[in-house]
C-alpha cells in the first residue's frame, strides 16, 4: 500500500507540499480496480506529487513508502509503478508496437517477447492490427489507449495517471471515461497485485466522481479529504 510520511516539497519560495502524511484508503467495493482521485487547481503541485511518488523528482523532505518500506533508495525502474503522462508522451520515432514494448525492453525482456506481449495488450483494448502504425497517424482516443497499454503491459503495482483526459476534446473525454476502467481491467491482468490501484490526478470534479472511489484535494500544500 502507498503511504506518504511528512512529505514536503518547495519550488523556490513556493511550498507545494507541507509535511503531507497520507495512507491509501480502504475501498469497500472496487470490482478489482481501486481509484483514488487527487483534485486541485493548476499549479497546486498535483503532478509534482505524482512525479515524487514515481521517483522522477525528489522531495525536499519526508518519504514515500510502499508496503511499509521506504522507497528513498529504490530507483525508478525498480519501484514497479507506471506513470501515464498528461500528453501521452508517445515516441514519434517508434511504431505503436514498439512504443508499448518499450517498458518491457527496459526491464530486460527480449525484443521478440516484448513485441508479442505488446500485440496481445493492444488486442485487449481493441487495437488489434495497430502494431505497425505510426503513433502520429492515430486519433486522440487511440493515442490515449496506446499510452495506457504501454503503462500497464509491465503489470505495475500502482498506476499513476496525470490528467489522462485533458488532451482530448470534451465529447471524447466523456466517451472514453466510461470505458477507461474496463480497459484497465483487460490490459492489467493482476499478476503483481490482486487489486489494481490507480492514483488519478485531475482538475475535473465530475471526472473524479465518475471514476474515483475516494478523493482528496491538494490545497495550500495539504491533502484535504473530499469523499
Residue spans for each PLM region:
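Conserved ABC ATPase signature
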Residues: 134-138, 142
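Short helical segment in ABC ATPase nucleotide-binding domains corresponding to the A-loop/adjacent helical element
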Residues: 97-105, 115, 119
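Conserved ABC ATPase "signature" region
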Residues: 112-130, 181-188
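Helix-to-loop junction immediately C-terminal to a conserved catalytic motif
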Residues: 54
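ABC ATPase NBD coupling module
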Residues: 70-85, 106, 111, 115
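A short, proline-enriched helix->beta-strand linker immediately N-terminal to the Walker B motif
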Residues: 153-157
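Catalytic Walker B motif of ABC-type/P-loop ATPase nucleotide-binding domains
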Residues: 159-163
